[in-house]
Amino acid sequence: ELLKRMKEITGNEVIKTIEDAELVNKQGEPLDVLVIAPATGSTLSKMADGDSDTPILMMAKEMFRNNRPVVLGIATNDGLGLSAKNIGILLSTKNVYFIPFGQDDPFGKPNSLVARFDLMVPTIVEALKKEQLQPVLEKH
């Protein structure tokens, strides 16, 4: 039911496989921007390592090949733990832009980082200009 509704809203087929994801930028015009939100610790790790074992990671890889922006909206309980190194790698990766993020519960979950999803649209606007919306570190 959800997939049917998504197709109705977008007018496009839902991308469900890695093979489908590979074809998106090869058939016609490439996407202007790809938004991955929420970007979990697992997604960040795989992207930082160059893995493309899911449709969304393959889409990101295709975007990088076409020099197009990828916007990430972090949502991970381990952002200031083991995932911090992956965030660091991605912060310095060409064509990766972050929705500003911060600690959502510094005392209850001190390693948790979550994007300010209310800043998604301004982040996309800046990413299309090849700029990172600042400040990238925000107080929640």
Say what each PLM segment does.
Residues 1-54, 61-70, 77-140:
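A cross-family phosphate/adenosyl-ligand binding-site feature
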